[in-house]
Amino acid sequence: WRYNHPDATQTVYLQGGIHGIELTGIPVVHEFIKEIEEHQLAYNFICVPLSNPMGLDSQIMGVQTGYNNIHTNQQNCWNWNRISNLKDEPSQEGHWIKTLLDLAKPADIVLDLHTAGVEAVPHIYSHVTEVKHTEGLGIPHVLAWSNRSYSFADTHHQLGKIALTFELSSSRVVRSEWMEESLI
């Protein structure tokens, strides 16, 4: 999904569901799309609500069964946290990863939404030089890294972009008021 504002000077790339079964980011991105359309935000946006549809195949009735493809029992153990290392893989996953990286190329700001887990509090991963960009986002906990990690966010940080990874609520509990708080 793309949105282009005539006065925009920056482009934001927003994705959810890169780990497939981490479902929280998917409805959050959909809600954010509604906000963009309603408020005509002065940015260009590239939104990918479900950035890893193949990853949905590693669960049965909402429970993760591991990283094997349920239908073929072949290991799909791609570490999507280290996405830049996989972009040249001659596989469906490698092609998809390259597509995601290409979609994010024009972005000045890259936001990657994940699911924190049942007992974790929402938090943001940020490079130490980008912590200032996390202020005022409504998530008080920030984990900063300094070493190269090859994550989706780090790959874009290395290209000079603002890149943040959001670890949101549990995928089993997504409340609309939480989404509203995060979107405002």
What are these regions (language model features)?
Residues W1-I184:
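Structured catalytic-domain cores with a bias toward divalent-metal coordination
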